[in-house]
Every structure is written in C-alpha cells, then in structure tokens.
C-alpha cells in the first residue's frame, strides 16, 4: 500500500445515505488498506494533539498506513463511533478491526507491539488480496477459450506496439482467442505479474 490517505468516498446523493449505505462505506474505509488511522486532519496537518501523537507513533515505527480525516465527513465521524463502539478519535484499524485510540496506540508504540501488529496486519492483508486476485485470474482463465491474451487495449485497438504484434501473430495462425484489456483493471494487471511470474 502507499502512504496516501485512504479514499474519502462520498455518497452520490449529497450526504443523505441510509444506515446500510453508511455501514458498507465504513467497512470499505476500514479495510481498503491494512492499517488505517481515522483522525482529525491528516498526517501532514493533524488538527488535534491526540491525532498528531498517534500519527507520529505510526510514522516513527516505520509503518505504511492510510489516514482518513473525520472532520471532512460528518457521516463517517458519527457513524464510526457506533460502528467501533469507541467514542473518541483517533481510531486505529488493522484489517478492519479496531486496535484502539491514542492511549492504546502510544502504549503499543512504547512496548514494540505497534510495529509488530501493524506488520502482521499488512502481511495478512497482502496475502488475502493476492489470493482474491488469483481467484479472479483463475476465473477469467476458466471462462476463456484455449488461448487468452492479456493485453493493453483490444485486438481492434491495441494500446501498445507489443500488444499489436502479438495480436497480428495470433491472427495469422487463424486460431480463435480471447483477450483481456489490462488497462481496464489494474488489480488484474498487477496480479498477473505475480501470478505468471512475468513482469511485462
């Protein structure tokens, strides 16, 4: 994962989301990255001392983590208190599970468990994501003809010279084949590199 903030998904209807929609969004926000700190402000500009201390503890431990500015979204700010049964901020989530607030984060930093638990969460999240991606790849392969070309673009509109050359070569064989446009699905694009152990 990157050190970018987690995406701040807004409802399409100007903030009037149902409880069910908010619940789904909270699940998404707490699991979109393995380590997420819900805080006032962001790591560059914390808006309270507790948020600053928690963010610094994660940064000082060398943890890759996302943040979500609860001041930017009142639905999340209020909804997460109920979701987590935790009334204050910041709140640290590891793989969708509440690890604790500022006091717990600082205790974990002091005894060394913050780094360990965050690293374990990252490892578990990455493994689960790889497994999900591999299942998607296997499903795509199972539904395709004997020949499947993962390419940039489509046979009629290849988006790179290499894809164009392979399409021309396949067309010359007269064999039927399917294609998958990797430019439309970055998860598959990156996952195929690992799945096939081939970087390009």
Each model region followed by its residue ranges:
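N-terminal leader/targeting and pre-domain segments
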Residues: 1-36, 116-144, 148
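A short, hydrophobic beta-strand/beta-hairpin element that forms part of a small beta-sheet core
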Residues: 1, 88-104, 200
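Eukaryotic short linear interaction motifs
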Residues: 44-47, 76-77, 107, 156-159, ...
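Thiol/disulfide oxidoreductase modules built on the thioredoxin-like
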Residues: 82-88, 194-199
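Local sequence-structure signature of Cys/Sec-based thiol-disulfide redox active-site neighborhoods
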Residues: 26-64, 138-176
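Thiol-based oxidoreductase modules, predominantly thioredoxin-like and allied folds used
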Residues: 59, 63-77, 175-189
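Non-catalytic, surface beta->alpha helical segment in thiol-disulfide oxidoreductase systems
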Residues: 94-123
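Eukaryotic intrinsically disordered and solvent-exposed regulatory patches
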Residues: 22-25, 76-80, 133-136, 188-193
């Amino acid at each position: 994962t990157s050190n970018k903030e987690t995406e701040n998904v807004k409802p399409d209807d100007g903030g009037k989301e149902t409880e069910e929609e908010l619940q789904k969004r909270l699940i998404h926000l707490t699991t979109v990255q393995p380590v997420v700190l819900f805080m006032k402000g962001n790591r560059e500009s914390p808006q309270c001392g507790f948020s600053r201390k928690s963010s610094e503890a994660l940064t000082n431990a060398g943890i890759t983590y996302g943040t979500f500015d609860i001041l930017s979204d009142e639905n999340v700010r209020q909804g997460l208190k109920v979701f987590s049964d935790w009334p204050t901020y910041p709140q640290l989530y590891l793989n969708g599970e509440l690890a604790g607030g500022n006091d717990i984060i600082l205790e974990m930093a002091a005894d060394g468990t913050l780094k360990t638990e965050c690293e374990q969460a990252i490892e578990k999240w990455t493994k689960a994501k790889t497994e999900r991606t591999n299942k998607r790849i296997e499903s795509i392969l199972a539904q395709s003809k004997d020949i499947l070309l993962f390419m940039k673009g489509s046979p009629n509109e290849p988006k790179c010279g290499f894809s164009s050359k392979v399409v021309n070569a396949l067309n010359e064989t007269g064999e039927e084949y399917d294609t998958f446009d990797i430019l439309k699905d970055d998860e598959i694009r990156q996952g195929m590199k690992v799945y096939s152990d081939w970087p390009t």
